[in-house]
A protein has these predicted regions:
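Short amphipathic alpha-helical segments
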Residues: 5, 70-72, 80
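A short N-terminal helical cap/helix-turn-helix that marks the beginning
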Residues: 13-31, 51-75
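Active-site diphosphate/adenylate-binding microenvironment
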Residues: 32-54
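A non-catalytic, amphipathic alpha-helix used as a structural packing/dimerization or gating element
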Residues: 7, 11-18, 91-98
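Short, contiguous pre-domain boundary segments
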Residues: 1-7
Length: 114
């Protein structure tokens, strides 16, 4: 194990709130969290409970907004079927939007878990 990896890992174990606060700086937040970890109801811990983010935005829109829309976002390479495909951020966002629309048509609403 590399020395750097070991240092990062140890910090994540010994100082989890400090570690994840630093990591959270690399994520786009609509509302930045002030509470990193709530341990009041173990083992049901709550992370970033007062923050608001969106995984899809961080995975796709953020990169498109920063000029990477035509760059490859996903490479599909199936060892079973030998099918291969590449998707740009723009293409992937279009497919995700269509799927989100299908879920909405099935009654899924904001805040639901799918």
């Amino acid at each position: 194990m590399s020395k750097k990896f070991e240092q990062i890992y140890n910090k994540s174990i010994t100082k989890p709130e400090e570690f994840w606060r630093e990591i959270s700086e690399d994520i786009f937040w609509f509302k930045k969290p002030t509470k990193i970890l709530n341990k009041s109801n173990p083992p049901f811990y709550k992370w970033f409970e007062d923050g608001t983010t969106n995984t899809c935005y961080n995975a796709l829109d953020f990169h498109i907004d920063n000029g990477l829309g035509e760059k490859t976002a996903l490479i599909y390479d199936s060892p079973i079927t030998s099918n291969k495909a590449k998707f740009t951020y723009n293409e992937l966002k279009s497919k995700v939007s269509k799927f989100a629309g299908a879920l909405k048509n099935q009654g899924l609403q904001k805040g639901d878990r799918a």
